[in-house]
């Protein structure tokens, strides 16, 4: 989930077999610095998770047989496994690692996260950057008992994966159930299965983003790559994780503006606040409009589900726009920080999505926020 979102999982597994299978090593020297860098990248997550990070190197010995595997000879397979174990052993001796069985880790996790005390709200936070392909791309994963979200800085901070755990679905899996193989929790947004912003057909894929428009020109923030910085603050007594994105410049034919995005994840709240700040505008009198939107559906695969049971609603004065999805017992809504024009849109057969949004004229130095709220709908 953290790193293999865009490609081959072999490139992001921290046991040596995966790194060899991904061919991320020097064929002449049989060295694989990427393996150690990747392990260290997982270790780095302790900075964002109250001093804790987790990594696993679980492999059976079968792939080290003397007949070799894939294109690697036995000697390289054995060397890579030995080197990997030695690196973990070195970290342990330096007091930088504690090795546990899975049952020991389960006990540690329940205590660490407050589950034993009946107070499980602390999230898992994973800022992740590409250290393999040279893309300079960043993702951020947020997961707590109420939701899981992925923010893609390569798409201007768009939310590209969203799971509404707050519904706490009973979802039996296995033989004799409706879900024999598919153990996935249903998504509201999933850009790989439901296209995201970059769709090849008429219509739209699932994404939570914003558009800026001026005199018939339109720019989606999905087209504005940037980077983010993670912080944690207590706001109104609530622990909040904050992503502060680097400002982006948006240039229309006769107006240029600089916009900054902040995304707030309040612990235990099941909502995400997205705040847009206009830092500068070349013409303060220009008519520029902001369209905050979420295009969503539900499902676990790339195949559309039955959308006929979904109810879209817009409250008087557009204090909230919402969708209730009975099939996954979920209500999703957007609410604004100031008066704005709320709207709802139905999908159609070739683009089976629904859309919720707010449109507002924005001015220089203005700050406008919207909340994406998730609730259980009985």
Identify the role of each PLM range.
Residues 1-107, 361-364, 371-375:
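Catalytic grooves of carbohydrate-active enzymes
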Residues 26-40, 50-60, 234, 244-249, ...:
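Beta-strand-rich recognition/accessory modules
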Residues 99, 294-316:
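Solvent-exposed beta-hairpin/edge-strand motifs
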Residues 110-151:
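Surface beta-strand/loop "capping" patches
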Residues 239-304:
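Acidic, contiguous internal or C-terminal segments within carbohydrate-active enzymes
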Residues 146-153, 255-267, 321-336:
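Broad, structure-driven detector of short, well-ordered beta-strand segments within folded domains
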Residues 63-68, 148-150, 169-173, 246-259, ...:
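Short, surface-exposed beta-strand/loop "edge" segments at domain boundaries and coil↔beta transitions
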Residues 148-251:
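Acidic-aromatic substrate-binding/catalytic surfaces of carbohydrate-active enzymes
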């Amino acid at each position: 989930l953290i790193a293999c979102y865009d490609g081959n999982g072999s490139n992001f597994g921290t046991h040596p077999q995966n790194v060899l299978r991904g061919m991320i090593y020097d064929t002449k020297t049989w060295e694989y610095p990427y393996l150690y860098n990747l392990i260290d990248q997982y270790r780095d997550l302790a900075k964002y998770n109250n001093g804790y990070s987790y990594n696993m190197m679980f492999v059976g010995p079968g792939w080290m047989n003397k007949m070799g595997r894939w294109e690697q000879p036995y000697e390289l397979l054995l060397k890579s496994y030995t080197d990997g174990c030695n690196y973990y052993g070195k970290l342990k001796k330096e007091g930088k690692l504690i090795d546990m069985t899975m049952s020991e880790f389960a006990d540690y996790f329940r205590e660490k996260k407050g589950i034993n005390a009946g107070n499980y709200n602390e999230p898992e936070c994973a800022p992740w950057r590409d250290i393999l392909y040279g893309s300079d791309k960043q993702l951020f994963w947020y997961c707590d008992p109420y939701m899981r979200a992925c923010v893609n800085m390569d798409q201007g901070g768009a939310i590209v994966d969203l799971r509404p755990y707050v519904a706490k679905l009973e979802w039996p899996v296995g033989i004799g159930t409706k879900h024999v193989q598919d153990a996935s929790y249903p998504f509201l947004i999933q850009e790989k299965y439901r296209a995201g912003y970059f769709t090849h057909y008429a219509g739209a894929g699932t994404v939570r983003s914003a558009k800026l428009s001026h005199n018939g020109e339109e720019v989606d923030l999905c087209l504005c790559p940037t980077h983010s910085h993670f912080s944690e603050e207590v706001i109104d007594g609530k622990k909040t994780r904050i992503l502060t994105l680097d400002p982006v410049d948006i240039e229309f034919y006769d107006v240029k503006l600089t916009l900054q995005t902040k995304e707030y994840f309040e612990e235990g709240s099941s909502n995400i606040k997205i705040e847009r700040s206009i830092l500068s505008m070349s013409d303060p009198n220009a008519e520029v409009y902001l369209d905050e939107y979420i295009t969503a559906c539900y499902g676990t695969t790339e195949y559309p589900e039955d959308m006929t049971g979904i109810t879209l609603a817009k409250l008087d004065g557009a204090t909230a726009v919402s969708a209730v999805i009975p099939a996954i017992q979920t209500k999703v809504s957007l609410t604004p920080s100031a008066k704005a024009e709320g709207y709802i849109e139905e999908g159609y057969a070739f683009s089976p999505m629904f859309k919720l949004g707010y449109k507002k004229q924005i001015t220089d130095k203005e700050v406008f926020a919207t909340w994406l709220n998730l609730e259980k709908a009985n």
